[in-house]
């Protein structure tokens, strides 16, 4: 997700013991590069990103988590799994624009 949307911001605090989760839509993706190949290392997120209502949520989109998140083999070799907590903190401009467009034209989500 972050590879294709450069305006998304990662948390990047020191990772704790909590394991990152992925929703059905994001299941099987690498958290950093969005590839579906060779899952390798389990994703750890910081305690702040796993607190309260955020517990068990998808690391990428914030939906309800169904499976554990993994880094792919390439990201593990390049040591991108050691950069800190990979949880995406902001919405990004595309989702924000979509929200305001829907609000402007009066579309309701079913």
From Swiss-Prot:
Keywords: Acetylation, Activator, DNA-binding, Metal-binding, mRNA processing, mRNA splicing, Nucleus, Phosphoprotein, RNA-binding, Spliceosome, Transcription, Transcription regulation, Zinc. Its main location: nucleus. Zn(2+) 2 binds at residues 23, 26, 58, 61. It comes from the Eukaryota. Residues 79-82 are annotated as: Interaction with SF3B3. Residues 35-51 are annotated as: Interaction with SF3B1 and SF3B3. The record marks 17 as: Interaction with SF3B3. Zn(2+) 3 binds at residues 30, 33, 72, 75. Changing residue 36 to E/S/A: Alters the structure of the presumed branchpoint (BP) adenosine binding pocket within the splicing factor SF3B complex which may lead to decreased binding affinity and thus affect pre-mRNA splicing. The modification Phosphoserine is found at residue 94. GO terms for molecular function: DNA binding; RNA binding; zinc ion binding. Component of the 17S U2 SnRNP complex of the spliceosome, a large ribonucleoprotein complex that removes introns from transcribed pre-mRNAs. The 17S U2 SnRNP complex (1) directly participates in early spliceosome assembly and (2) mediates recognition of the intron branch site during pre-mRNA splicing by promoting the selection of the pre-mRNA branch-site adenosine, the nucleophile for the first step of splicing. Component of the 17S U2 SnRNP complex, a ribonucleoprotein complex that contains small nuclear RNA (snRNA) U2 and a number of specific proteins. Part of the SF3B subcomplex of the 17S U2 SnRNP complex. SF3B associates with the splicing subcomplex SF3A and a 12S RNA unit to form the U2 small nuclear ribonucleoproteins complex (U2 snRNP). Within the SF3B complex interacts directly with SF3B1 and SF3B3. Component of the minor spliceosome, which splices U12-type introns. Within this complex, interacts with CRIPT. Interacts (via N-terminus) with U2AF1 and SRSF5; acts to bridge the two. This is PHD finger-like domain-containing protein 5A. The lineage of its organism: Eukaryota, Metazoa, Chordata, Craniata, Vertebrata.
